[in-house]
Amino acid sequence: MGLETEKADVQLFMDDDSYSHHSGLEYADPEKFVDSGQDRDPHRLNSHLKLGFEDVIAEPVTTHSFDKVWICSHALFEISKYVMYKFLTVFLSIPLAFLAGILFATLSCLHIWIIMPFVKTCLMVLPSVQTIWKSVTDAIIAPLCTSIGRSFSSVSLQLSHD
């Protein structure tokens, strides 16, 4: 419905002074803490989560809302995404990190102390099991399959058109 032909670019700017990066506590040695400017996803594990407003909400050329509605909805989308992410990470990041640590520690322990010794034991015993399996296959399974194959090879089918 808007009459403007140029695409509007909406950006949200926040000054560093308007919000706090931490809880307001003064730490004794700030060099011990992670710099918030560094890349926290160096291996690009979550590159698929970089969604913008246009990736989620898109209006075709034939149906446009008013420009002010588009700008306000874009701003509300960005603000709500920012605020909700911060809110959820405050309450979920520490418990989920704790649970993930327990899970990975348990899986590592199982892999190191149970799975790998079992696999190594199987690989040590495997040559003798392979010899026994080959003998069973040659003595029982191969003659059975051969006789079944010979029985079915003598079967012939004829189709008649009635």
Swiss-Prot record:
Source organism of this protein record: Saimiri boliviensis boliviensis (Bolivian squirrel monkey)
An individual GO BP term: regulation of mitotic nuclear division
Family label: Belongs to the caveolin family.
Source superkingdom: Eukaryota
Keyword field: Cell membrane, Cytoplasm, Golgi apparatus, Membrane, Nucleus, Phosphoprotein
Main location: nucleus
Entry protein name: Caveolin-2
Role according to the record: May act as a scaffolding protein within caveolar membranes. Interacts directly with G-protein alpha subunits and can functionally regulate their activity. Acts as an accessory protein in conjunction with CAV1 in targeting to lipid rafts and driving caveolae formation. The Ser-36 phosphorylated form has a role in modulating mitosis in endothelial cells. Positive regulator of cellular mitogenesis of the MAPK signaling pathway. Required for the insulin-stimulated nuclear translocation and activation of MAPK1 and STAT3, and the subsequent regulation of cell cycle progression.
Topological region Cytoplasmic: 1-86, 108-162
Oligomer and partners: Monomer or homodimer. Interacts with CAV1; the interaction forms a stable heterooligomeric complex that is required for targeting to lipid rafts and for caveolae formation. Tyrosine phosphorylated forms do not form heterooligomers with the Tyr-19-phosphorylated form existing as a monomer or dimer, and the Tyr-27-form as a monomer only. Interacts (tyrosine phosphorylated form) with the SH2 domain-containing proteins, RASA1, NCK1 and SRC. Interacts (tyrosine phosphorylated form) with INSR, the interaction (Tyr-27-phosphorylated form) is increased on insulin stimulation.
Phosphotyrosine carried by residues: Y19, Y27
PTM comment text: Phosphorylated on serine and tyrosine residues. CAV1 promotes phosphorylation on Ser-23 which then targets the complex to the plasma membrane, lipid rafts and caveolae. Phosphorylation on Ser-36 appears to modulate mitosis in endothelial cells. Phosphorylation on both Tyr-19 and Tyr-27 is required for insulin-induced 'Ser-727' phosphorylation of STAT3 and its activation. Phosphorylation on Tyr-19 is required for insulin-induced phosphorylation of MAPK1 and DNA binding of STAT3. Tyrosine phosphorylation is induced by both EGF and insulin (By. similarity).
